[in-house]
Every structure is written in structure tokens, then in C-alpha cells.
A protein has these predicted regions:
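Conserved blade-register residue in beta-propeller folds
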Residues: 120, 164, 215, 286-288, ...
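Bacterial signal peptide processing site
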Residues: 29-31
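Carboxylate/His-rich catalytic cores and anion/metal-binding grooves
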Residues: 118-132, 215-229, 248, 254-255, ...
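Inter-blade boundary loops/turns of WD-repeat beta-propellers
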Residues: 70-73, 123, 167, 218, ...
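C-terminal motif of bacterial Sec signal peptides marking the signal peptidase cleavage site
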Residues: 23-27
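Aromatic (tryptophan-biased) beta-strands that constitute blades/sheets of beta-rich domains
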Residues: 34-93, 127-136, 171-180, 222-231, ...
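Repeat-blade elements of multi-bladed beta-propeller folds
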Residues: 47-57, 94-117, 138-162, 184-213, ...
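Bacterial N-terminal signal peptides that target proteins for export
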Residues: 2-16
């Protein structure tokens, strides 16, 4: 289960998708107040593109066209801010209103908030071009949500529906609220689109059932295939006990005709894992499927019988080691894995962040060898490990990790009962060839902005509302900037621009205030 920095109630699967589209000046009429765009004098207009949720279909989060480097990063200035208003600005406890990165194509920024509303903005000015209103607050879960864009169409989802919009006008092309059956959870994922197919997944937070991976026809929305991430006797129904699985983050589109998802944990307590141990396939796994048919090619399970919420949920990354295609994987389990992309065979794995000796406890429970004394503290905990996506560039893997142990006071909890220590974070570089740690930089709070490469810099954001850049060679922090609010979403870096969803709750930022917003920073 993706770590929740706050909670949201889920709506039933039968809830209809209610949508309205407001275009240009009409965005101000009726309903919630229109979002507000503010331009700032003295800054260059943003330029460039970030065409996919993680920058490219390989999920590398490396911006080869970026102009920002250590030589000019100090010149970043706020060019514009797009502020959410009304119910979309309220946020949800500590989650905030923006948890997904924007997508930028053709001079337009496409953004989705936590209420599933979609916005199209002019990249140069931040002005609203159109808005697609879903307005289903308090029901779309912890996200990340977000959109994908291809061939003039914007693809998105709410908790129970998927939809396609005209990128030019925001008008609905198709929408389907009948994709998920009872027990298959909700859509939380930022989709991906390639080869005429839209790839989605549901995830599930509690109770029997399980998530499902799927592909839709991009033109019609017709369901092409599904793959259940728990082994069951019916669609998405776990036969081995409580199930979860599903996928939270954008999948990897392979050049070999495959699609790879990182999946979440089985929703089971320590007591259940000890009393009724099972591998719980295909939870906490990399699942490689034929992109056209959904047929399983291979899988790699990181944590069989997981009871500590150690998802392998991060977006997989495609790269090569010595000419061999490789998939880089990671997640809340607190490990980075290099897998042979043809077979799923493990090449290396490296622990990142804080670990306190309980990495093999789920395996011990599987073989009936685990005895636990309470209180029982685990690091990484259910809110720790790798919570945002990684980056790969020039022979290195870049990882942002959260150090936050979780304490269980009894055997019935699934995600732990209380924090087991202070929260902090780390940003690390690993050798792509060997997995060896190249450097490790400590940060005082949670790095949630994902790892993003721009020339000789690595960017991310901290939850308390700070944009930072590190020297890729040494890990030294060479740039810091206070954001308007806290930050709980990956950023985008391209051309002369850094786009930052500063969408956390305004009360939790140190020195920040105002509505959640997307902020564009540019160099001259």
C-alpha cells in the first residue's frame, strides 16, 4: 500500500463520473472559484518539454534538453504561479492537493489535482486554457493520480473511472466508469500511453480483494486486457487471504513490446503472515507483461509474505549495463534492484536509507521461523524507504529515501501503530554497474519530489517546502529555495524551467503560505 501521509475515504465503484469542462474565460462561471494565474516580472518565459510522467517512456527522469546546471542554478527566478482554489485547494490532511508531476507538450502544461480535476495551462504564462472538473473530493485516495498525453489526447483517471480528453479543448472523447469490479480497489496511478494503448492499474488499501493491471484502447477506451496482481478464484479476489497488490506508479514501456509494473504489498497483519504464510504472488513484485496481450513474461518478487507494507511500487526504469537491457526497481522496501530486463534475473540489490535488521522477517515467517516480541520496530517502516521515483543518468542511479521507523504494539496492525523514531531523509547515488553507494547525503525531512537529473545537478523537493539541487559528483547541496507551501509531488525539469507542484497543505510549510500551486522557475 502506498504510504499515506494522510487518509481519504473511498467512493463506491458505482459512483458515476460527473464532469464539466470550462474553457478560457468560462472557467470562472459557477461551482468553485476559478484557479488564479500570477506572472512575475523579470523572469524569462518557460520553455522546453516534459512529455511523459517521468520525462520519457523509459522513466529515467533525466532531462537531456535541460539548460540548468551548477553554473546558473542560482539564477532561478519565479516566472509564474498557478494557484488552486475552492475545494481543490483544501487538500486532504497532510497529503495536500497536488501529488503528481505535470506533463508538458507543445507549449502546454497538463496537471491533475487530488480531486481528479485536470488543467491545461500555457507554459509561457501559466494562464488557464481549459479545466476539466471532476470535483470528487475526499475519495480518490493518496494518489499520485496525474495524466498522460499523446497524439493530442489527455488521459486520466478518477478513483473509479478512466477518461480521455481533447488536449486542445478539454472536451471528453471517452469516459468509462465500469472498468473495476468489487474488490479491485481504486485508480490511484498516473497512467502511461504508448502504441495505441493506455496502461492503468488499480490499488487496494484494505480488505479482501486485489489490484488489477490493465490496458485500454487509446482511441475508444475499450478494455483490451487485465492482469490480477493477486492469485485468486475470481477477478481480483485473493484465494490465499487478504490481498492488495495493484500498482501506484507509472509503468515502464519497453522497446521489446513489454510493459512492466511495480506492485504493492499484500494487506495483511503480522499475525496473519505468521499464522497463514504465503508468497502472495504477485505482490511486492516487478511484473513484466506482453504489452499487447497482458500475458506474463516474468516476475521478480522482492518480499514474499510481506507484513510491513514494503511495496516495490516505484516506476521501473529501463537502462543497460554492459549492453544488457536492465530494469531498475525500488520502493518502500528500501532496496534498489537491478534486474535483467529479458528474464527478471537479479543482477544486484543495494539497501538504501535506514535498516534495523528486520529485512528478512517476512521470509522467516514464510518458513515458520519468526517469533516477535512487542513493541516491534521496523525500519524502513510503512512510511519510509523509497517513496518517490528514482532517476538514472551517466552510469548512476539516484534515489531519495525516507528514514522513519514504525513501531507495532501488537500483531493485528497492518501498517504499524506509531512512529518508531524521528523522521529524516537521505539522497543517494549508486553505481549502475555494481549497485555500490557513490555518495549519501542526509536531509532533515522527507524528500518527496522524486530524483530528477539536469546536467550536473540532481533536483528534488522536501516535504516542508524546499526545492534543492545537489552536485551529482559529490552529493553536496548547492541550491535551496523556499516554496510557497509544502511539497508532496515529483517535479519536472526541462529547458530553462523547473516546474514544482507546491501542493501540500499550506499549514505545514515552514515559512510558506497561500493556496496549493504549480510554480514555474526559470533561468535567464
Amino acid at each position: 500500500m502506498r504510504a499515506k501521509l494522510g487518509g481519504r475515504a473511498r467512493a463506491g465503484a458505482a459512483l458515476a463520473l460527473v464532469v464539466s469542462v470550462t474553457v478560457l474565460a468560462a472557467a470562472c462561471s459557477g461551482g468553485s472559484p476559478a484557479p488564479v494565474s500570477t506572472a512575475f516580472a523579470g523572469a524569462a518565459a518557460p520553455s522546453g518539454s516534459w512529455p511523459d510522467p517521468n520525462g520519457d517512456l523509459a522513466n529515467t527522469r533525466n532531462a537531456p534538453d535541460a539548460e540548468i546546471s551548477a553554473a546558473n542554478v542560482s539564477g532561478l527566478r519565479e516566472a509564474w504561479a498557478f494557484k488552486l482554489t475552492g475545494t481543490a485547494a483544501a487538500g486532504v490532511q497532510s497529503l495536500g492537493s497536488l501529488t503528481a508531476p505535470p506533463v508538458v507538450q507543445g507549449g502546454v502544461v497538463y496537471l491533475q489535482d487530488q480531486d481528479a480535476n485536470v488543467y491545461a495551462l500555457a507554459l509561457a504564462t501559466g494562464k488557464l486554457k481549459w479545466e476539466y472538473q471532476v470535483n470528487l473530493p475526499e475519495q480518490s485516495g493518496p494518489g499520485p493520480d496525474g495524466v498522460a498525453v499523446a497524439d493530442g489526447v489527455v488521459y486520466g483517471d478518477s478513483s473509479t473511472s478512466a477518461f480521455a480528453l481533447s488536449a486542445a479543448t478539454g472536451q471528453t472523447i471517452w469516459a468509462d466508469s465500469n472498468l473495476l469490479n468489487s474488490g479491485q480497489g481504486a485508480f490511484e496511478i498516473q497512467p502511461q500511453v504508448a502504441g495505441g494503448r493506455v496502461y492503468l492499474a488499480s490499488a487496494y488499501g484494505s480488505g479482501p480483494g486485489g489490484g488489477v493491471l490493465m490496458a485500454l484502447n487509446a482511441s475508444t477506451g475499450h478494455l483490451l486486457w487485465t492482469f490480477n496482481t493477486v492469485i485468486g478464484v475470481g477477478a481480483g479476489v485473493q484465494a490465499l487471504g487478504l490481498g492488495s497488490g495493484g500498482a501506484w506508479e507509472t509503468p515502464l514501456i519497453g522497446t521489446d513490446g513489454s510493459v512492466t509494473f511495480g506492485t504493492g504489498n499484500p494487506y495483511q497483519s503480522i499475525g496473519e503472515a505468521i499464522a497463514h504464510p504465503s508468497r502472495q504472488l504477485y505482490t511486492d513484485s516487478e511484473v513484466n507483461l506482453d504489452a499487447a496481450t497482458g500475458k506474463l513474461r516474468w516476475y521478480y518478487q522482492a518480499v514474499p509474505n510481506d507484513f510491513a507494507d514494503h511495496d516495490l511500487q516505484s516506476s521501473p526504469i529501463a537502462t543497460t549495463i554492459g549492453g544488457v537491457p536492465v530494469t531498475i526497481a525500488g520502493g518502500k522496501v528500501g532496496y534498489v534492484y537491478a534486474l535483467n530486463a529479458r528474464t527478471g534475473a537479479l543482477l544486484w540489490k543495494t539497501p538504501v536509507g535506514e535498516h534495523n535488521g528486520h529485512d528478512n522477517d517476512s521470509l522467516l515467517a514464510l518458513s515458520h521461523q519468526l517469533t516477535i516480541t512487542y513493541p516491534y520496530t521496523v525500519a524502513p517502516g510503512s512510511l519510509g524507504g523509497i517513496l518517490s521515483n528514482m532517476a538514472v543518468a551517466d552510469g548512476s542511479v539516484y534515489v531519495a529515501t525516507i528514514d522513519l521507523p514504525i513501531t507495532y504494539t501488537g500483531s493485528n496492525s497492518v501498517t504499524g501503530n506509531k512512529a518508531g523514531g524521528p523522521e529524516s531523509g537521505e539522497i543517494e547515488a549508486l553505481s549502475l554497474a555494481t549497485g555500490k553507494v557513490e555518495w549519501d547525503t542526509k536531509v532533515a525531512t522527507l524528500p518527496l519530489g522524486a530524483a530528477t537529473v539536469s546536467n550536473n545537478l540532481l533536483f528534488t523537493t522536501l516535504y516542508t517546502g524546499t526545492l534543492i539541487a545537489l552536485d551529482r559528483a559529490t552529493g553536496a547541496i548547492v541550491y535551496q529555495h523556499q516554496l510557497p507551501t509544502s511539497a508532496n509531488a515529483p517535479i519536472a525539469v526541462f529547458g530553462n524551467t523547473v516546474l514544482v507542484p507546491s501542493g501540500g497543505p499550506k499549514t505545514s510549510a515552514k515559512g510558506g503560505g497561500g493556496n496549493p500551486q504549480l510554480v514555474a522557475y526559470t533561468i535567464p
